[in-house]
Amino acid sequence: MAITANLASTCSAISGGVRRVAFISLGDIAEGAISVTSGEVDTITLATGKEFFSYDAEQDTIEWRENGEMVNGSLKYTEEIELYIRGNNKTNRDAIVALVEDLCGVLAIVEDSNGTIFLIGWSEDLDLDRPLKMASDASGSGKELTDLAGSTITMTCMSPHKAFPITGITWATLTTPAS
């Protein structure tokens, strides 16, 4: 790909952080059910009754990272989502187990603090072949009364592209069972 345009800086505010994250099992999306137009995801067809499930985390504890590198002449991006789920109760632990033990992998949608939604765990070239999978699950009680008690989950995948933004599809549409 050649450089074909200038990049001008903008004076508008850009905030860091992630507002929310939701996951769906790989088996709930058919191959070819996602399409991209002009570098943006504009179609995601979910199986009937399926949806992305929101994982509420502590404020300012969700992070999406995208690290690119050139290896042997090939571009590779490592996508990571890290979130902290407060508490070690059964409900939280069951939700974590469902996420990290999904051996076929998951896709995620992440909404950043600027309102842009990204699809993570899918690539136009590889379709559903490189979904997100658990990299780590670190749970603990903390030592003192004011220490964090809960789980830090890291999900990761590799792709030949940066994650695609989603346009024309709302968060509410993706997190409501498909009909």
Regions found by a protein language model. Name each.
Residues A2, T10-E82, L128-L145:
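Solvent-exposed edge beta-strands and adjacent loop segments
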Residues D28-E31, N88-K90, G115-I117, D127, ...:
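Generic "edge-of-domain/loop-turn" microfeature
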Residues G68-T91, D147-H161:
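Oligomerization/assembly interface segments of phage tail-like spikes and tubes
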Residues N72-G73, A98-V100, I109-V110, K143-D147:
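A general structural signal for short secondary-structure junctions and capping/turn motifs
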Residues K90-A98, F164-T167:
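Short, conserved charged micro-motifs
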Residues V97-E124:
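Short, acidic/charged, Gly/Pro-enriched secondary-structure junctions
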Residues D125-S179:
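Mixed-charge, glycine-accented linear interaction segment located at domain edges/termini
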